[in-house]
Amino acid sequence: VATTAPYSEPTAETAAHLDEIWHTPHTLYGRLATVDHKIIGLRYLVTSFVFLVLGGLEAAAMRAQLAQPNLHLLSPEAYNQIFTMHGTTMIFWYAAPILSGFSNYLWPLLLGSRDMALPRVNALSYWLFLFSGIFLYSSALVGQMPDRGWFAYAPMTELRYSPALNMDFYALAILFLTISTTVGSINFLVTMLKMRAPGMSINRMPIMIWSTATISLSVLFALPSLSAACIFLFFDRRLAMHFFDSAQGGSPLLWQHLFWFFGHPWVYIVVLPAMGMASMMIPTFCRRPLAGHTYVVMATIMTGLIGF
């Protein structure tokens, strides 16, 4: 049973106007301002791969330092910074964004829609993602990269233990990234609900749509705690609000509660889209329909719920 409005053929005038709107001008501004889902998806993939390379180089630097005892390739401060940047890059700027790239590219094709439901929001999500990564790595220009681990446990992130700007870069960069991920998740959910082709009912949606929609909903519940933790950390350091300072009535455990409320479902947020893609590719190459489609959907949703 179709759950969307019946298809209507546009007039020639309307079709010409829509083609003009959807056309991407072959200029620098046109390419930068494009809202085409395929281009944005490819940008996610390329940018995520760049961050993968950066994270890999950081891992190689750490392994080189540990290759033999008593090497002095990195100072203790530089090692802590590279260790933190490696974990932060791989977890936040590669693992999830690479899957966003695939989803941005494939979702409209799978749903039979022209584009994502909110194309400009889609573009905003990418540019915020890119800006947050550039902002994080700009800390290297002043020699103050984050240095307290990718999990940034309090109280080591307090101003008296980390007086430079290291953890300020961390808190603000992740805050920008959470905004990017949140608006992107909203876009995915709206696209699923409003942009399905005629005849594409909920129970006919491909598994990849279900898996990405599940993690998009998880993101909307999980990321606010991380955003709040980063705001508290920045306020702690720059406005002396003492959220994590036990000497002033705060609690270092508050950071862990907020961070891991996000961290536990994040594992499944990263895994489920990949499982969704595998659940589409394997039946395709086997030339067989997916066995137990309904049960796979139920398992996907339950995995997202249990992640919390």
Which stretches of residues belong to each language-model region?
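Membrane-embedded and interfacial regions of multi-pass energy-transducing membrane proteins
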Residues: 2-308
